[in-house]
Amino acid sequence: MGRFAGVFFNRKVRKGFRKGRGDVARLSIVPPRTTLTLIAQLMSWNSIIGQQRVKNILQHAISENKIAHGYCFWGMEGVGKDALALEFAKVVNCLEPRVTSSGIESCDNCRSCHQSDKLEHPNIKFVFSLPAGKSTDSRDDSPIFRLSDDQIKLIQEQMHIKSENPYHNITIPNASQIRISSIRDVKKSVTMSASQSGRRVVIISEADEMTTEAANAFLKTLEEPHDQVTLILTTARHDTLPQTILSRCQQIYCEPLSDEDIAENLVLKMGVERSEARLISSFAQGSYAKACEFLDEDMRAMRLDVIEILRSALKKSYYRADMLFKIEKLTGEKDRTRVEMMLMLLMIWLRDCYAYSLAGNNAMIINIDQQETIEKFSGAFTGADYPAAIQSVEEAISHVRRNVQLQLTLLTMLITCRRIFLREV
């Protein structure tokens, strides 16, 4: 399955390890297949969501043969930094690249492209945090020698998912640091003769997770550029990286994605219904990876539950018992993340009601499948101070994040909304 942190994978079944060229280990385990909801597509610049400015910069650098020795792709999590780095690596190694009106593309058909798509290309090295593993006496051992068979299997599975979905955030238990052994392995690999023509590209994913020792070792590698080698850092926290490293890289900002781009890709790639995709994208805050995480949540059921609580609070009479019962039911598991999501759903729903009260059928609303309900609610509370109600929900979200007692937070918000909509003194 390609290479990670200095490890080469091949497709033949053997037992154990054997030494490959130099001191780099070859791991011979057939990667397991993982069932994905993702509709697999060939990687290309067009498969990367948004980021047109960054694509133009990279394509121009390739076309004009002005590729930097080091890059730092930075921006919030889930906006495609790894996807951009992997596609760049694929294009510069393509055997038959195509020049188009928009720039330069990989052919998607040659052996090199197929290797890149599977993260199996010998010229592409993808480095990320690994567990510490067992200690060894040798400082030259590849970090893979420290890991158990179960850890190696999990890493293979995560790399397979990454090859199918470059927006996937690799998650390995007890892996929070990129250690010096991984960077030593990088240095070793870029100094060896390449086994295949093309440009060697090393991608350090979430580079801010490098230890101080690892960062110092990486700096030395940056200071000794090699022909046909490019080092790419990706990070959501570039301000935590040493300035000595950043100053030697071309820094490229990857901006948050638009709700429209996220929703469109949820529909096309994940098969999500358009109305649900719009709802999820409004939560994602510009991150496609975060949007994908929300796919496991029953957003519509949560939305219905929180709207029902609001309706209970707005009953003319005998509302307290029903409202308190529903609050207790909602907060029974003390799941703050779920409560926060439900409050965000309520906030978006109230914003839609406010927009509808101002523009009627011309309003641009997120909860398009709730238009009839929104119309009825807006009609029942004409002239209501929606901004004040929305602010009360925002304050409740803030209290949830600050660990204020959940039942008290929801009760205060609902009583405030009742006073606003029923105009109680």
Locations of regions flagged by a protein language model:
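Charged, glycine-rich active-site and insertion segments that engage polyanionic ligands
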Residues: 44-104, 111-115, 227-230, 236-345, ...
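Clamp-loader machinery-focused feature within the broader ASCE/P-loop NTPase space
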Residues: 39-213
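Short, low-complexity, charge-dense intrinsically disordered segments
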Residues: 1-5, 11-41
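Conserved adenine-binding aromatic site and its adjacent loop/helix in ATP-hydrolyzing domains
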Residues: 188, 220, 243, 247
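Loop/turn-to-beta-strand initiation segments
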Residues: 196-201, 226-232
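Conserved catalytic/switch belt of AAA+ P-loop NTPases
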Residues: 191, 217-227
